[in-house]
Amino acid sequence: MQQTYKPNTSALKDGAPKATVDQKQLLPCKYRVGRVLGGGTYATVREAVHIETNKMYAAKIMNKKMMEKKQDFVKNEIAILKRVSYEHPNILHLVDFFETVNNLYLITELATGGELFDRICAKGSFYEADAAALMRTTTSAVKYLHDNGIVHRDLKPENLLYRSKDPNSDLLIADFGLSHFYEDSQYYMLMTACGTPEYMAPEVFRRTGYGKPVDMWAIGVITYFLLSGYTPFARPSQVEVIEAILANEYTFNDPCWSGISETAKDFIKKCLENDPSKRLTAADALKHPFLSEKRPATSNLLPNVRENFNARKTFRTAYNAVRAFNTWKKLENKH
């Protein structure tokens, strides 16, 4: 069966890499897809090579039938990427988007440098100044999103990718699948609970409405994670995570925090302010001494960060195994 190609070339800005060739060309002749990079309930992300130019991209492939009631999310993601692509060096670029009879395709640049935390762990050292530089870059990109009326809603280390393996590669904010337009002038408050629980702000769980401050809460959680190797509200179960977030229960009591400056802790506290109206804005965060001033020399944080991360990962694996076993025993006893 011949597949219909519906080009949307308005996504491409002047000067952007052109993935589109002959507009009459039919899919699947335009791109050749390769290995799977990731996926979820509604989409698969694969490597894609443009046949004409041989350039590599990432293709987010969404089955129309599976997305039947979720197509607004796709349109929203495309609209957001169209607004911000190519205007900021630290935001993943949209290259093209189109549809076939069965699928929707979203083509973006291929970030080959890996995830933020993996890059950190592969290094021989990591200092507070390195964490500050990374968060300065990320906060600058978040400010750009907010200035353009966009809330990301799913900021976390897994969505911070390096453009290439080059040591000086740009760090990119990726995955705008949960992002949303938000105009302050409309006094519109988002209500949908979405994101990754450990990085979600308390107002999201309260269902009282939320906006741009949720991204700054996530900035605080990410900063805490980079400096320690664990998130501030890490708990054995998701229910306990949510309870800790709502109660704003976190500390700097672990020995790993003894070598972290009070300036860094103050930055985290102001991002993790329970009241969103008192939380740092992206603009204010960039003026905070942690991001705006040169950080003092500190000891290498990497050994502690690695140790804490691996210890909690092992604990969580064991906890999940015990929980699965107990669930299985309950089911077995019912029969």
UniProtKB/Swiss-Prot annotation:
Swiss-Prot/TrEMBL keywords: ATP-binding, Calmodulin-binding, Cytoplasm, Kinase, Nucleotide-binding, Phosphoprotein, Serine/threonine-protein kinase, Transferase
GO cellular component, one term: cytoplasm
Stretches assigned to the Protein kinase domain: 31-291
Domain of life the protein comes from: Eukaryota
Compartments, as annotated in UniProt: Cytoplasm
Annotated positions of the Phosphothreonine modification: T192
Primary subcellular site in the record, as a coarse category: cytoplasm
Residues annotated as the enzyme's active site: D154
Enzyme Commission number: 2.7.11.17
InterPro entries linked: Kinase-like_dom_sf, Prot_kinase_dom, Protein_kinase_ATP_BS, Ser/Thr_kinase_AS
Chain sites annotated for binding ATP: L37, G38, G39, G40, T41, Y42, A43, T44, V45
GO function terms (MF aspect): ATP binding; calcium/calmodulin-dependent protein kinase activity; calmodulin binding; protein kinase activity; protein serine kinase activity
Gene3D superfamilies reported in the protein's UniProt record: Phosphorylase Kinase, domain 1, Transferase(Phosphotransferase) domain 1
GO biological process, one term: negative regulation of transcription by transcription factor localization
Function: Important in cell cycle regulation.
Similarity annotation: Belongs to the protein kinase superfamily. CAMK Ser/Thr protein kinase family. CaMK subfamily.
Record protein name field: Calcium/calmodulin-dependent protein kinase type I
